[in-house]
UniProtKB/Swiss-Prot annotation:
Transmembrane segments: none
Record carries keyword Chaperone: no
Gene: csm6
Keyword terms, alphabetized: Antiviral defense, Endonuclease, Hydrolase, Nuclease
Source organism: Enterococcus italicus (strain DSM 15952 / CCUG 50447 / LMG 22039 / TP 1.5)
Name used for this protein in its record: CRISPR system endoribonuclease Csm6
Region (CARF domain): 1-155
Length: 430
């Protein structure tokens, strides 16, 4: 089904003994339904011009397409020269047409109305282009309408017969205009906003929805690769090239970048759940680097090497006993044979180094551990206002970066901003 939506300004069904724009579209596209829009003042006219009600618009249209359904809409517009005056009204009418006829193709006549009407329709198309087309009609002489002969209401039947006879063999003066430059400008700004929020999947979908888009193929490829890397936790190729011989650094840096990205885009609960595991991995590398052989691995799981230092073993047992005062349960060397995690690493470093940068940063991560367990294991909701939780999570995220730099001081500051640099590269392609 084809529907023509056509606002009518101070124009006539035909001029210079030839079709007017609306009539020309009807002649060459043969729509099943025509919706004409008039302002009340244009419809009724005044002392300076006769209103459009003087013309039999239904008869005029059906003289070309006798089975066409015609609906005339007439509304009072307070400020007719205001470009915003028609925006909501036109949108409402077009939504109604789409709801009544969901499979219809809607043609928008952007030639017959006032400049304000035509501009509004163009913007409507740019914003909601699905199943719509903008149709522009050239004048018969492909020039301005100055000094042309206009239709007269009192002899419209004679004029209509002449026009139909002359126009029946004439080529179409209709042009489908995509207004791609306007549409692309809006889409580019939308993509930039999505990039700023690190919403790469939505950005990819938006780029992919455009049939013709500058650098579209390259942008889609880059976005798809980044999305796959993030989903699969694959180290970015840039980081591999930057640090080709240090896989542990690559992994730690990747996850620190992703952690900060999630925090910046407001994905706070996910940030809270991930921060401890990333900190744990980084601290494990710190211990391996500064205290070799303190950790031994059984089936790739970390365990405390009780043979590392008798003094450390005794100090660690004493620390565990002090925490078990209520149960009076004494810890033994055999009871230390268990998989290690962040709390144990924190204990070791407090015993080995007392107070230093690493243990101070670990305390910031440990401060949110109970909150993390409630969200991750009890599936509790997150309240950022309670107990300064928002600030504590921010401190923990910042601590992870500081810890990473303590273990891998060769990491460059710019590397933490890799995603912002990636975003900028896409914006330049746009």
């Amino acid at each position: 089904m084809k529907i023509l939506f056509s606002p009518i300004g101070n124009t006539d069904p035909w001029r210079n003994d030839r079709d007017g724009a609306m009539l020309h579209i009807v002649r060459h596209y043969q729509p099943d339904r025509v919706v004409l829009f008039f302002t009340e003042s244009i419809w009724q006219g005044n002392q300076h011009f006769s209103g459009q009600q003087a013309f039999d618009w239904v008869k005029i249209i059906q003289s070309i397409n006798e089975n066409c359904q015609i609906e005339i809409k007439c509304d009072t517009i307070e400020v007719e020269n205001d470009f915003d005056a028609y925006k909501d009204l036109f949108h409402q009418y077009l939504v109604e047409e789409k709801r009544k006829y969901p499979n219809a193709e809607i043609f928008l006549n952007v030639t017959s109305g006032t400049p304000q009407m035509e501009t509004t329709l163009c913007l409507e198309y740019v914003t909601y282009p699905d199943k719509m087309r903008c149709i522009q009609v050239s004048t018969p002489l492909k020039t301005s309408n100055a000094k042309t002969k206009y239709a007269q209401a009192d002899c419209q039947e004679v004029d209509l017969e002449i026009v139909n006879e002359e126009e029946s063999q004439q080529p179409s003066r209709c042009h489908k205009i995509a207004i791609l430059s306007f549409r692309e400008a809006i889409v580019r700004n939308q993509i930039k906003s999505l990039l700023d929020n690190y919403d790469y999947e939505a950005a990819l979908q938006l780029v992919a929805s455009q049939k013709s888009f500058r650098n579209g193929k390259e942008i889609r490829k880059k976005l798809k690769e980044l999305i796959d890397d993030i989903k699969m936790h694959r180290v970015f190729s840039y980081l591999i090239k930057q640090y080709p011989r240090n896989e542990k650094l690559q992994k730690a840096l990747l996850h620190t970048i992703l952690l900060e990205m999630r925090h910046q885009r407001g994905d706070i609960a996910e940030t809270l759940i991930r921060v401890k595991s990333i900190a744990e991995y980084i601290v494990e590398q710190y211990i391996q680097k500064n205290y070799p052989y303190l950790i031994i691995y059984k089936e790739d799981k970390p365990y405390f090497n009780v043979s590392y230092s008798q003094e450390l073993t005794e100090s660690y047992l004493a620390l565990m006993d002090s925490r078990n005062k209520k149960t009076n349960k004494k810890m033994t060397v055999d009871s230390l044979d268990r998989i290690l995690g962040f709390p144990a690493y924190r204990d070791f470093l407090q015993l080995l180094e007392a107070s230093n940068e690493m243990t101070n940063e670990m305390n910031k991560v440990n401060e949110i551990n109970n909150l993390r367990n409630k969200v991750a294991h009890n599936l509790d909701s997150l309240n950022l206002d309670r107990d300064k939780n928002g600030r504590k999570i921010t401190n923990a995220v910042t601590a992870v970066r500081t810890m990473l730099l303590a273990v891998f001081p060769e990491v460059q500051e710019n590397d933490f901003h890799y995603l912002k640099q990636f975003n900028q590269s896409i914006k330049e392609l746009l």
